Amino acid sequence: MQSNKTFNLEKQNHTPRKHHQHHHQQQHHQQQQQQPPPPPIPANGQQASSQNEGLTIDLKNFRKPGEKTFTQRSRLFVGNLPPDITEEEMRKLFEKYGKAGEVFIHKDKGFGFIRLETRTLAEIAKVELDNMPLRGKQLRVRFACHSASLTVRNLPQYVSNELLEEAFSVFGQVERAVVIVDDRGRPSGKGIVEFSGKPAARKALDRCSEGSFLLTTFPRPVTVEPMDQLDDEEGLPEKLVIKNQQFHKEREQPPRFAQPGSFEYEYAMRWKALIEMEKQQQDQVDRNIKEAREKLEMEMEAARHEHQVMLMRQDLMRRQEELRRMEELHNQEVQKRKQLELRQEEERRRREEEMRRQQEEMMRRQQEGFKGTFPDAREQEIRMGQMAMGGAMGINNRGAMPPAPVPAGTPAPPGPATMMPDGTLGLTPPTTERFGQAATMEGIGAIGGTPPAFNRAAPGAEFAPNKRRRY
């Protein structure tokens, strides 16, 4: 359907304007008679119609799936514009082909630029509006040069359009990325990258020229250079050739084959020999470059193998070093744990020894306190002995007094003590009770009734020196 419309439009452009309008009006009148009236045009801007022509374009049919809109590829150059044209008139001129994204007019030089939604719509507008008369001038519509496009060479074999776009998107927004292939679909090692602006293209060109930009594992960098803007669609029409003196001189002879033996033939053959030599030298250069590439690839593979082996060795050494370091750390941890256990054991023993000493000290203090409160038997015997000796001395003093007359035949009363032949008193040892004065002392008789406590002398008796009566 699209090709038929394009063919009809191209055919109409080669007919006179009046005949074209008359023929189109007749065709439109016949369509109105045969078909019902068309539905109303929606207000969403997806369909548009021109004032001069009744042809409508469905914009949905001219947009490919996933195609980016308003790119540099859909930018048109419009020449031979009237000097008084405005942007509003130019938008109205292209209103049939959808909403324009960019309109620029250079009134002094008589040209301008306009950007449409898609490449297909721009192609249709170019075909329909090229050579259209406008205020006494014929419009010249061409595709604008893409100044932000780059040519990429030395692409690896397994680089696709998507990978190429992803790789160069680090420099800026990429509108289109294409890997050029031959007629069999095999990659040629070349590609085209189109950016949305010149700064991104300049950045990519500078970075790739200064460094080595790799796209795959294969370490062959790509080369980037500005793309040659060549017009292989319109070419050079006869009407655009400058008709100067050199033009007329060159056009004196029509196209022909040179006759053998003539002047033209001789120099034509010399030109052919030069061209053949250039071709042979170019082929030789290509062969040398190919051999050098193959040699470099072989060296690169060998070096890559050695590099991988070296990396494996380094990784093995690194792992061994890491294992050794882990073992050292483990040994240090074990030593620290052992030292900690030894310190804990020593601390435990020290605490036990301290507790034992404290217990012994406590027991010793308890024993000393018990002894201080309750004197032992030896001390008690000494004290009782001293008391007994004091009492004996008092008795002896008493015995020095003249005895009372005792009737004959009366037995002597029992005294408190009896002098032994060895000069000692016949006293019984004191008891071990705490209060010895309460015990009954043998060998000491009652003197005038109940014996006094602590060996007190009888009333009226004389006391020893340094002794006083106890009450």
UniProtKB/Swiss-Prot annotation:
Keyword set includes S-adenosyl-L-methionine: no
Entry-linked InterPro entries: NOPS (IPR012975), Nucleotide-bd_a/b_plait_sf (IPR012677), p54nrb_RRM1 (IPR034552), RBD_domain_sf (IPR035979), RRM_dom (IPR000504)
Coiled-coil boundaries: 268-372
Record's protein name: Non-POU domain-containing octamer-binding protein
Modified residues (N6-acetyllysine): 5, 11, 198, 295, 371
GO terms for biological process, alphabetical: activation of innate immune response; cellular response to angiotensin; cellular response to hypoxia; circadian rhythm; DNA recombination; DNA repair; innate immune response; mRNA processing
Modified residues (Phosphothreonine): 6, 428, 440, 450
Tissue specificity: Heart, brain, placenta, lung, liver, skeletal muscle, kidney and pancreas. Also found in a number of breast tumor cell lines.
Annotated region described as DBHS, given as residue ranges: 54-373
Organism (species): Homo sapiens
Subunit field text: Monomer and component of the SFPQ-NONO complex, which is probably a heterotetramer of two 52 kDa (NONO) and two 100 kDa (SFPQ) subunits. NONO is a component of spliceosome and U5.4/6 snRNP complexes. Interacts with CPNE4 (via VWFA domain). Forms heterodimers with PSPC1; this involves formation of a coiled coil domain by helices from both proteins. Part of complex consisting of SFPQ, NONO and MATR3. Part of a complex consisting of SFPQ, NONO and NR5A1. Part of a complex consisting of SFPQ, NONO and TOP1. Interacts with SPI1 and SPIB. Interacts with RNF43. Interacts with PER1 and PER2. (Microbial infection) Interacts with HIV-2 Capsid protein p24; interacts with high affinity. Interacts with HIV-1 Capsid protein p24; interacts with low affinity.
Biological function: DNA- and RNA binding protein, involved in several nuclear processes. Binds the conventional octamer sequence in double-stranded DNA. Also binds single-stranded DNA and RNA at a site independent of the duplex site. Involved in pre-mRNA splicing, probably as a heterodimer with SFPQ. Interacts with U5 snRNA, probably by binding to a purine-rich sequence located on the 3' side of U5 snRNA stem 1b. Together with PSPC1, required for the formation of nuclear paraspeckles. The SFPQ-NONO heteromer associated with MATR3 may play a role in nuclear retention of defective RNAs.
Modified residues (Phosphoserine): 147, 262
Bias (Basic residues): 14-27
Entry-annotated residues carrying N-acetylmethionine: 1
Region (Disordered): 1-51, 443-471
Domain RRM residue range list: 74-141, 148-229
Feature: compositional bias, Polar residues: 1-10
Family annotation (Pfam families): NOPS, RRM_1
Disease / disorder: A chromosomal aberration involving NONO may be a cause of papillary renal cell carcinoma (PRCC). Translocation t(X;X)(p11.2;q13.1) with TFE3.
Covalent cross-link Glycyl lysine isopeptide (Lys-Gly) (interchain with G-Cter in SUMO2) as placed by the record, residue numbers: 5, 60, 96, 99, 126, 190, 198, 243, 249, 371, 467
Keywords carried by this UniProt record: Acetylation, Activator, Biological rhythms, Chromosomal rearrangement, Chromosome, Coiled coil, DNA damage, DNA recombination, DNA repair, DNA-binding, Immunity, Innate immunity, Intellectual disability, Isopeptide bond, Methylation, mRNA processing, mRNA splicing, Nucleus, Phosphoprotein, Repeat, Repressor, RNA-binding, Transcription, Transcription regulation, Ubl conjugation
GO molecular function, one term: chromatin binding
Compartmental location: Nucleus; Nucleus, Nucleolus; Nucleus speckle; Chromosome
Domain of life: Eukaryota
